[in-house]
């Protein structure tokens, strides 16, 4: 018999309903979360036995949307959901990021979290609902999980912070920020902003953290009612004697290796030290597993690097904690692209290209909350060669999709509107070399490439990745972190923005005790770094070029009466098809009569525009036109007075004399002058040559 446990609470303007005990009862835990009819089923399954040889935490997070949630059929031939969409992948990553720090160190059991959207209110985004459900399900599951976390979306409308704004409210918001946190600390931030200040962004994070305490309190209350006992588990025991041996053999040599600034040279040196340690220890005891030694060596490497920074020494590559790596920037490096730039920061470089297209190149996105068209595409590629590795090359991975979206968020606020720049814009960032902060290099490279392409962005944008090393009350904030510093650090904090303010912010925290003061210091230090990079970018290109590439399509816009659209299109598209083929142009017509003509050749575009004006021109009674004889019949002749307008000259209107045979006066393709006598209700045109006979002679 079903025995539901239901818990309700008010969260902002919405009531949240947490329900368990009815659906998915064979999962370790399952919670159905309802927020204003947006319902997400969250299931958690954990395995109590660790797989033999397991060396990492195998957490899987899958967020999936079902079209039945919106009362719709899936697209495609099979009418069934297929591979995850980009939106589903991004939300899966957003759920995953605050989860990982909350599992205890050394916990290696398999855990899978699946969040399925089963009902959707088009005004309530399911991502926050899913995150609340995941927190609740893990908290009651009995799986070792430190504490529940909350989630909130924060908007900024009319100088006021808004908790969980609706989709409609977000249109008017200058901020879209998602924050997840525990009762004591922020875990994750993902945001997009319209050039807000550091103070405004910090206040938004604090606001979201404070508001979601209600979620955490209610999940804790639910745990007291239905929570399962925590599993007993034991972390892998570290051999302290082996640890001492590794430290004795490697510590001094690693300290020397960390003085080598070149990444490849340093990596070779560290690999040599590791190989020597393995060889020495296995000669003493052949039963010691290589992987065990490697893990101890990696932990020692991490601790030495952290201690050096906390002790006030220079960083791995010889910089102090605020210094930015050397910068090199170039534009117009690929002659046939519509815009291009190479952005180099230390050993990280992004080759960025811009392609301009028409409205028909825009991406049509079908989401549960409705369809939309995206005119700005940004794709990020991270090939294996950029880190000196061999790997599979194919469709983008989750990481590439996530980094591309972050870079896009950083640029969106400065992109022109469709009225200001009627092009679809595609940016591709090829990471050709990587040693940290490649997503922020993509932001800088994109800004340069857009200006090179003549896209009138509102301001230049730069991005920088910040890091943190913290032990108790001692901490150091790092500007422009390397990949090693990302690995050893306690925070990954990416900030993009212009000189006017922040456009995107992403933060992931891996440790406890990150205070608001630390976040404020990191934001201020990131601003200094951003300003330095922007100043360097201005020396390369300070504003968008006044003209687009000669290889890009020129878009010309004219307005016609909506009633004339059918004339331009023609029967089954015959007129517009012939026109595009003849003039080698791309023609798009909107319902309001806006016509866009795109062509790389301006002369061809003008030819198409003249033809469209000719087709849509109003025929005025009493006006005289040049016309071509198209047909001769017994009772007169048909004269084409425009490309799609034809009128009849009756035999009695050819001349003032009596005409016995029309062919005696007119021939096919003859050019004559005609006067419009009448246009009837059906659009039929009656013409006369009488008043123009002198000219026709």
Swiss-Prot record:
Chief location bin: cytoplasm
Ligand binding (Mg(2+)): 486, 492
Gene3D superfamilies xref list: GHMP Kinase, N-terminal domain (3.30.230.70), K Homology domain, type 1 (3.30.1370.10), Nucleic acid-binding proteins (2.40.50.140)
GO terms under biological process: mRNA catabolic process; RNA processing
Cofactor entry: Mg(2+)
Matching InterPro entries: ExoRNase_PH_dom1, ExoRNase_PH_dom2, ExoRNase_PH_dom2_sf, KH_dom, KH_dom_type_1, KH_dom_type_1_sf, NA-bd_OB-fold, PNPase
Gene Ontology annotations for the cellular component aspect, listed alphabetically: cytosol
Subcellular location: Cytoplasm
Residues in the signal sequence: none
Keyword field contains Kinase: no
Source taxon at top rank: Bacteria
EC code(s) of this entry: 2.7.7.8
CDD domains noted in UniProt: KH-I_PNPase, RNase_PH_PNPase_1, RNase_PH_PNPase_2, S1_PNPase
Record keywords: Cytoplasm, Magnesium, Metal-binding, Nucleotidyltransferase, RNA-binding, Transferase
Functional note: Involved in mRNA degradation. Catalyzes the phosphorolysis of single-stranded polyribonucleotides processively in the 3'- to 5'-direction.
Similarity-based family: Belongs to the polyribonucleotide nucleotidyltransferase family.
Assembly and interaction partners: Component of the RNA degradosome, which is a multiprotein complex involved in RNA processing and mRNA degradation.
Alphabetized HAMAP family for the sequence: PNPase (MF_01595)
Name of this chain's protein: Polyribonucleotide nucleotidyltransferase
Native organism: Baumannia cicadellinicola subsp. Homalodisca coagulata
């Amino acid at each position: 018999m079903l025995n539901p446990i239901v818990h309700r609470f008010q969260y902002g303007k919405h009531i949240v309903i947490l329900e368990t005990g009815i659906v998915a009862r064979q999962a370790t835990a399952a919670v159905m979360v309802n927020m204003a009819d947006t319902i997400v089923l969250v299931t958690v399954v954990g395995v109590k036995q660790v797989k033999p040889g397991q060396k990492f935490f195998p957490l899987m997070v899958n967020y999936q949307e079902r079209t039945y949630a919106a009362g719709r059929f899936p697209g495609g031939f099979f009418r069934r959901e297929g591979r995850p969409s980009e939106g589903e992948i991004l939300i899966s990553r957003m759920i995953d990021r605050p989860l990982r720090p909350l599992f205890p160190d050394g916990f290696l059991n398999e855990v899978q979290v699946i969040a399925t959207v089963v009902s959707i209110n088009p005004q309530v985004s399911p991502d926050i609902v899913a995150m609340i459900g995941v927190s609740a399900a893990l908290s009651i599951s009995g799986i070792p999980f430190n504490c529940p976390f909350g989630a909130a979306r924060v908007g900024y409308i009319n100088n006021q912070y808004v908790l969980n704004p609706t989709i409609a409210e977000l249109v008017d918001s200058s901020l879209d920020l998602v924050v997840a946190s525990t009762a004591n600390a922020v875990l994750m931030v993902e945001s997009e902003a319209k050039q807000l200040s550091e103070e405004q962004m910090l206040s938004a994070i604090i606001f979201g953290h404070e508001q979601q305490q209600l979620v955490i309190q209610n999940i804790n209350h639910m745990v007291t009612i239905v929570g399962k006992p925590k599993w007993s588990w034991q972390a892998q025991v570290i051999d302290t004697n082996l640890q001492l041996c590794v430290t004795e053999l490697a510590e001094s040599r690693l300290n020397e290796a960390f003085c080598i600034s070149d990444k490849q040279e340093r990596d070779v040196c560290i690999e040599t030290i590791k190989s020597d340690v393995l060889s020495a220890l296995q000669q003493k005891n052949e039963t010691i597993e290589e992987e065990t030694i490697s893990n101890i060596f990696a932990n020692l490497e991490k601790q030495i690097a952290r201690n050096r920074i906390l002790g006030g020494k220079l960083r791995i590559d010889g910089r102090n904690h605020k210094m930015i790596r050397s910068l090199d920037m170039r534009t117009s490096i690929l002659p046939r692209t519509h815009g291009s730039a190479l952005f180099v920061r230390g050993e990280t470089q992004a080759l960025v290209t811009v392609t301009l297209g028409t409205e028909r190149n825009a991406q049509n996105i079908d989401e549960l909350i409705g369809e939309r068209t995206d005119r700005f595409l940004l794709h990020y590629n991270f090939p294996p060669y950029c880190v000196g590795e061999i790997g599979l090359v194919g469709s983008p991975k989750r990481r590439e999709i996530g980094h591309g979206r972050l870079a896009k968020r950083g640029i969106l606020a400065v992109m022109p509107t469709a009225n200001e720049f009627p092009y679809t814009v595609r940016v591709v960032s090829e990471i050709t070399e990587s040693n940290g902060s490649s997503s922020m290099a993509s932001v800088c490279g994109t800004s340069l490439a857009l200006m090179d392409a003549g896209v009138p962005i509102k301001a230049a944008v730069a991005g920088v990745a910040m890091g943190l090393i913290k032990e108790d009350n001692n901490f150091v904030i790092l500007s422009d972190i390397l990949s090693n510093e990302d690995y050893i650090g306690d925070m990954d904090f990416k900030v993009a923005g212009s000189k006017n303010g922040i456009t995107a912010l992403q933060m992931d925290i891996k440790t406890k005790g990150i205070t608001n003061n630390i976040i404020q210091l990191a934001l201020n230090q990131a601003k200094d770094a951003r300003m330095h990079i922007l100043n360097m970018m201005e020396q390369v290109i300070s504003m968008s070029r006044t003209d687009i590439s000669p290889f890009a399509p020129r878009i010309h816009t004219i307005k016609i009466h909506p009633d004339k659209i059918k004339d331009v299109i023609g029967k089954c598209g015959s007129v517009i098809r012939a026109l595009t083929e003849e003039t080698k142009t791309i023609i798009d017509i909107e319902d309001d009569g806006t016509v866009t003509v795109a062509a790389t050749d301006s002369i061809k575009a003008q030819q198409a525009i003249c033809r469209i004006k000719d087709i849509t021109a109003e025929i005025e009674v009493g006006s005289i036109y040049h016309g071509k004889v198209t047909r001769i019949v017994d009772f007169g002749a048909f004269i084409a007075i425009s490309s799609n307008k034809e009128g009849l000259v009756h035999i009695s209107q050819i001349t003032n004399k009596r005409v016995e045979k029309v062919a005696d006066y007119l021939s096919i393709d003859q050019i004559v002058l005609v006067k419009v006598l009448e246009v009837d209700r059906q659009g039929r045109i009656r013409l006369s040559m009488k008043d123009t006979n002198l000219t026709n002679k």
